[in-house]
Amino acid sequence: MSKWISLLKMKSKTFLDSLPSNFRNEKSFFIQNNLTDFEKLSNLSDLDINEIQRKSSLCTLNNLKKIRAIAIFKKEIGISPPQAYLLLHCGISSIKSLSLSTPYELERKVGRLEWILRVKNETGTTFSLLKEWIKKASQIDKSIWNLG
């Protein structure tokens, strides 16, 4: 029974709920302005982000751009917010930079970050998953270039 309850809780969790607490000001702004869907957040332009920062001085430019990047990773590749946040901490901030990475390089960066933070891999990122993400990112990157 408790397994079903935890599954229901997971389903009801929104994109914003899965973001770390250091985004609390941005989360508050998004909730107040009904911007809770990762699809909408992934489509924010730089102009939109600057406007949000102008309206709410507690929202930082850096955090707003990180949230947009996390939303893009989720929308385009299906990467969970915690996994996307891990990629950001490893220096991967876009589909393009992910497509140019190798699984070995990413595995090394993730391992180094975990060692520095003295944590185990809680996001479930495996070598094969890293390969899959890079493959998807490369396909997206190629399709963008083919449109132009």
Where are these regions (language model features)?
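C-terminal extensions
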Residues: 1-148
